[in-house]
């Protein structure tokens, strides 16, 4: 039995799955936590990866491995391959001003969307490089190469110390602001616009490219950004829109068309198969449920029970969930807000319901944006930690207006990386067709009132800088 390894280095933790390359059956797995924060030294990821690999029984017997990970994080290296400073992660919004400046300098969002498929916001890598150049010039002067979290971990696994050997894949490169998914080329002119000079950048590999080898000689796949890996790991069919409710919320679908959205709502990323992955991202997803549970002093099961005990629309109470600023819409300094607080709605059930509906309304807005840019949307595949909430599962169909499928809980990002590794080991034009467990299906009639209430309230928020 040939084995493959899939690695997911996420914001919170590192997961390693070892699967049968032919069937996809899980053989063993490991996990280790990452430190909190929006600024983390990559050595912490490497330490967690080693712990997770050890818990998973090692990689000596695998035929191939691939690493997927959180996107956009700026890993800045000097000429010797040493980390210059802790990585600024996707959820670090200090570069919001840099993003606004970059939009203006190129002539507007439409110019960026046409050039690289995405419009600058604080999440994307180039904005962090601009922030570094302006705010830490001594560190900026040391930078010889820049890469992303999964690139760096793959490079470390290969044993190389030469920055010229760093590799990446289309999906992760497409979130940098200096690589075009449409042309499959770097835009070094945009890198120089943002950072002031050129840098060594990872080679961008195709779906089955080899990024290096493990000590046992097994090939390392190109890896992927977390959302692209999740799309591969769920085995989504054409027209299946994946809604992932993790730290961030993501709505995405594989497509043959690269969207161009000058407003920046829909990001024109690439997927793991040579196609495109239009995606809408919100900064506030499962953390909204965490915050509501904390505020009410209950666990998540009780939060779900409370939410389902209140009527649809929460009798007019609306929670706008911009708890840590927001990326979609682009409001990095916004705060959350509760509207419609009356004597009737002043109880835990209404607040719980408003929290679930507010989070889902933000994601439903993302679905609308994908469809407006040509995406096919037949069903919703709901994954991530937030999908474990019974309230989320039962309320979602009324907001999305489509059947909602919930696969069994799993490590879909790591599974996608493992499936890619099996593809690299086997070769061929398509990834292996692994069998999957049947999902639970939830259906309900749409309730337009909920979306209408949210639309009326979402612009009435307070800027945290005032």
UniProtKB/Swiss-Prot annotation:
UniProt keyword DNA-binding, yes or no: no
Principal EC category: transferase
Protein EC: 2.7.1.17
Active site: 226
InterPro entries listed in its UniProt record: ATPase_NBD, Carb_kinase_FGGY, Carb_kinase_FGGY_CS, FGGY_C, FGGY_Carb_Kinase, FGGY_N, Xylulokinase
Reactions catalysed: D-xylulose + ATP = D-xylulose 5-phosphate + ADP + H(+)
Listed PROSITE patterns: FGGY_KINASES_1, FGGY_KINASES_2
Residues at which substrate binds: 71-72
GO molecular function: ATP binding; D-xylulokinase activity
Similarity remark: Belongs to the FGGY kinase family.
Annotated protein name in UniProt: Xylulose kinase
